[in-house]
């Protein structure tokens, strides 16, 4: 009995111990339960996310693959079988991309072929001489030859070219006919304004160059001074810009974006070119600005930004470089570039400037480049052609070529204006100023007292001295040279043009390109440094088809130029004084920086003397 109680008591104690143990186990720290709950939540979230991703993938596949059977199979496929489907989709995307690329390439090829066919047909039409589409490098506008011009017989065209002494060298063989009168110009908004009402017919350089420049071609124009070269490039410049929409720029942008740039070697020539060009531009709503050294930069900047930017800039190289370097001007939108007096622009003093300016423009394939000049040395030709694409070369006057390859590819020899009567007087250096005074009094006698006379000196100090000497003699005289401020130079030039002052003393700064009307006489007090400058000096008279006269006072100090001067006189069929021949006819042509080369002017008709030995 007692053992039974003892056994039951031990069982009860074990039961209590188990219950206590269970309670103790259930009462474990709460942290463990929290961790379990967190793990459980994370697992549930992960499962939900995976289900959501699978669902989105399934919907995407349903959209990409239309057959319903494939969609059903995809749902039932396990994860291991989903990989081939993804690969299949990737391959399909690659295939679609490849097909699109092939279509794009075929389309581009087709457009290239059509462009080639159009250009071929255009060239054929040009050759036939019926209609003349543009052979434009930039394709901005076209030139259609007038029906009346196309209808003219070829013999009449040849007679015109011969009479006007026009020689055209065209690498493209486009057979463009010269525009012989203004009615043959293609109709446009500008031409409808009748801008040439004051003129009778185009000058030879305008007549021959316009068909090429209006076609968008690059052009080299070589003609004597006073032949109308300024209008030869002004008309195609304005027509080119007027046919294109003007790009819009941010009004807050303090950088001018011109579409055309004309570069001139001197301030005076730049101002003169701007005056002619702006007259045409204003007729079709284009703006033009002239920038040059010696004037206030801020005023010129304000002109550049006025009216939402400028369309055409006429500039001297120095001031244009300044504005480019400071960011006031960007040439990135230039489609029309002109180098006026190109031989001087590309000569040693300006060649680096021109390279800098043209490098700021679009490539030569994307712009039209024109160069006009009175002289065109061979080395400058090669340099200039690197800026142009197949330029058409128009030469006015019977200019022979020295050297070359026998096909007219040598250097174009310099020639003076044949309408200018040239006279050379060999004088004592100490008596030049008194002889100048005598010539002026003789030239301004009677009814000729108001004739305008241009007097050239070599140095600035000499110009000041001559001006003071003539002023003391009672002659109304003004001067223009590098030591004067720009406003003083402009005032002197305007006084001479208006006739207030009848005598203008100038250095060579005024020799290049200035169009001063009604200059009756040019007097060279001192011979210039080069024969080219001599031709430009005397070219200030006899302009626009009129007659002129030039007198040169030659001294023993100038004898190095006697040979070149004799050749110029003979080519123009002018008398050569015996006193000048005494200085010799040797012509120095620079071939080496240190030594040079000397060539003697030999009469080809003179027979050699046979030498016999006993």
Swiss-Prot record:
Origin: domain of life: Eukaryota
UniProt entry tagged with the keyword RNA-binding: yes
Low complexity compositional bias, start-end: 117-138
Domain Helicase C-terminal: 435-584
Assigned keywords, A-Z: ATP-binding, Helicase, Hydrolase, Nucleotide-binding, Nucleus, Ribosome biogenesis, RNA-binding, rRNA processing
Cystine pairings recorded for this chain: none
EC number: 3.6.4.13
Sequence positions that bind ATP: 223-230
Principal subcellular localisation of the protein: nucleus
Basic and acidic residues compositional bias, start-end: 9-36
Residue numbers covered by motif DEAD box: 340-343
Reactions mediated catalytically: ATP + H2O = ADP + phosphate + H(+)
Sequence segments annotated as region (Disordered): 1-138
Keyword match ATP-binding: yes
Localization (cell): Nucleus, Nucleolus
Function: ATP-dependent RNA helicase required for 60S ribosomal subunit synthesis. Involved in efficient pre-rRNA processing, predominantly at site A3, which is necessary for the normal formation of 25S and 5.8S rRNAs.
Name of the featured protein: ATP-dependent RNA helicase dbp-3
Protein source organism: Neurospora crassa (strain ATCC 24698 / 74-OR23-1A / CBS 708.71 / DSM 1257 / FGSC 987)
